[in-house]
Amino acid sequence: MAAATVTVEEVRKAQRATGPATVLAIGTATPANCVHQADYPDYYFRITKSEHMTDLKEKFKRMCDKSQIRKRYMHLTEEYLAENPNMCAYMAPSLDARQDIVVVEVPKLGKAAAQKAIKEWGQPKSKITHLVFCTTSGVDMPGADYQLTKMLGLRPSVNRLMMYQQGCFAGGTVLRVAKDLAENNRGARVLVVCSEITAVTFRGPSESHLDSMVGQALFGDGAAAVIVGADPDERVERPLFQLVSASQTILPDSEGAIDGHLREVGLTFHLLKDVPGLISKNIERSLEEAFKPLGITDYNSIFWVAHPGGPAILDQVEAKVGLEKERLRATRHVLSEYGNMSSACVLFILDEMRKRSAEDGQATTGEGFDWGVLFGFGPGLTVETVVLHSVPITTGAAITA
C-alpha cells in the first residue's frame, strides 16, 4: 500500500483558521407590537381579568416602576389573548396554543434579524457554512434551525446546530460555540441567531407566586443575529469585535436560583430573591480568570456587555466591581428600550455599543477601549464569560445601513 502523502497534523493545520473568530455583522428585529411600561400594569390586569386583585396590582406596578424599562415589544396582542383566555390564566392548559404561535413566529423573527446581518455583511448567503439557532421558545422537529435555513434559502449542506431551553445566559453560549466553529473550520462563516418570544411564558398573576410576576414585568420579545468568521477578508468584510476567549461556569450554591419548567400550562419561570447577590458575589472570580492572563485588573478600563437580567443585578454588579456608571450605559439602554429578551439581549447590546461608539466619535467599537467583557447570566446559575477585543472605527464603519 502506498504511503500517505500528507500527515494528520498537516490536514489538521489546513483545516484551521489562523486568526481569532470575529463578529462581522449584527442585525436585530422585534415584533411590531410595542408595549409601554407605564401602561402595562393596567393592561396586564385587565386582559387577565385580575382587576379585583387590587393589592397585587399595586405590587406589580411597583415592580414595573423599578424595572428601569421604558418599553418592550411583544408578539402577543390584546386581540390574540382575548381569543385564548387560557393563556391569561395563571395555570391553565394552554401549551398547544402557545406552541402554535412560537413554532411559526420564532423562525420568522429570526429571519428578520438574520436578513439585516447578512445585508450588513454584504456577502452572498451561499458563503454561510454554519447556522447556530438559539431559542427558549417553541420546540418542533425539524427545528427552528431547519425552518430558518429554508426561509433564507441557505445551502442544504449548511451545518446546523439547534439550541433549545438554554435561557438568559445563552447569548454568550452561541458566541462561544460560533468561536469554536469559526476557528476550527478554515473559511467558515457562522450565522448565529437568537430569537425569543414570550408567548410561552405569559400568564396571569398569582398572589402565591410573585416570582412569576417578576418575569411578566421584565421580559420582552426580540431576535438578534451575528455573522462570525475568522481571518476576515477586509477588502469586503468589516470586523466589529474579536472573540478572544469564552468560558462557562456554574456558580456555587446556586441550584434552583433560576429555573423553568415546560408543562401543559406553558413555560413556568421561578427565581429566588438572592439571584442578584449570587451573581455579584461571584463576578470578580469570573473577571479574574478571564483577564488576569491579559494583565488587566482595572475593570473600568474595559467595555462591558452584560445581560440585563434586571436592574438589581446590574446595580449589584456595578457596586461590587466599583464600575463607573458609563460602563453599563449600553446595557441599561437596551434594558430600557426592549426589556429582558433572554438570549438575544447581549447581541442587542453589542449592536448598540458599536453604533453609539461610532456616533460619539470613539476610536474603537468598544467605546474607545481595546478590551471588553460579555456576560450571560441564567438558569443554573450559569455564567458565560466572553473576552472581546474591539476594532478601530474608520469613517462610516460600525453603523448598519
Swiss-Prot record:
InterPro entries (UniProt xref): Chalcone/stilbene_synt_C, Chalcone/stilbene_synt_N, Chalcone/stilbene_synthase_AS, Polyketide_synthase_type-III, Thiolase-like
Known pathway: Secondary metabolite biosynthesis; flavonoid biosynthesis
Pfam families noted in UniProt: Chal_sti_synt_C, Chal_sti_synt_N
Domain of life: Eukaryota
Enzyme class, broadest EC rank: transferase
Protein name: Chalcone synthase 3
Xref: PROSITE patterns: CHALCONE_SYNTH (PS00441)
Any one of the GO BP annotations: flavonoid biosynthetic process
Family, similarity comment: Belongs to the thiolase-like superfamily. Chalcone/stilbene synthases family.
Enzyme Commission number(s) of this protein: 2.3.1.74
Protein's job: The primary product of this enzyme is 4,2',4',6'-tetrahydroxychalcone (also termed naringenin-chalcone or chalcone) which can under specific conditions spontaneously isomerize into naringenin.
Catalytic center residues: 168
Gene Ontology MF terms in the entry: naringenin-chalcone synthase activity
Gene3D superfamilies: 3.40.47.10
Substrates-to-products reaction catalysed: (E)-4-coumaroyl-CoA + 3 malonyl-CoA + 3 H(+) = 2',4,4',6'-tetrahydroxychalcone + 3 CO2 + 4 CoA
UniProt organism field: Sorghum bicolor
